[in-house]
């Protein structure tokens, strides 16, 4: 396996992407937040003491995607063109599926920005609800889709 974030001496380095041509890059990442059905109903109905949980989490996810190079040491600062955070609420399972989509015309992919956005949106849901339910879980953080660059399209298969 080739790890391109290390030089021949084993030192961590930022990958040089200056020779690459910018292409449209898209990445979609997700995270799952688990909670009691009662808490999910309160979030859905806007009944949380701290306010609009999903609205605040959406803003946190957008901000996090834009701040990725400040959080992940070897990621490149990118001119992100679009970040969207959306949700699927499953009352039966007591889960919120957070999805973050990032687009940019860049020389490197936006997977880490999408993963960071989904993760921080999920953490914000936890933060705003922890007073009501300490058993909230966050997990299943994963890349769902990416396109752009020479590696082409990646789409996670169901159950993968």
UniProtKB/Swiss-Prot annotation:
Pathway the protein acts in: Cofactor biosynthesis; molybdopterin biosynthesis
A GO molecular function held by the record: cyclic pyranopterin monophosphate synthase activity
Subunit-level organization: Homohexamer; trimer of dimers.
Pfam families, A to Z: MoaC (PF01967)
Catalytic reaction annotation: (8S)-3',8-cyclo-7,8-dihydroguanosine 5'-triphosphate = cyclic pyranopterin phosphate + diphosphate
Protein name, per record: Cyclic pyranopterin monophosphate synthase
Gene (UniProt): moaC
EC nos: 4.6.1.17
Entry keywords, A to Z: Lyase, Molybdenum cofactor biosynthesis
Native source organism of the sequence: Pelobacter propionicus (strain DSM 2379 / NBRC 103807 / OttBd1)
Known function: Catalyzes the conversion of (8S)-3',8-cyclo-7,8-dihydroguanosine 5'-triphosphate to cyclic pyranopterin monophosphate (cPMP).
Top EC class for this record: lyase
Domain of life: Bacteria
Gene Ontology biological process terms, A to Z: Mo-molybdopterin cofactor biosynthetic process
Active-site residue list: 127
Gene3D superfamilies: Molybdopterin cofactor biosynthesis C (MoaC) domain
Binding, substrate: 74-76, 112-113
Family statement drawn from the similarity comment of this UniProt entry: Belongs to the MoaC family.
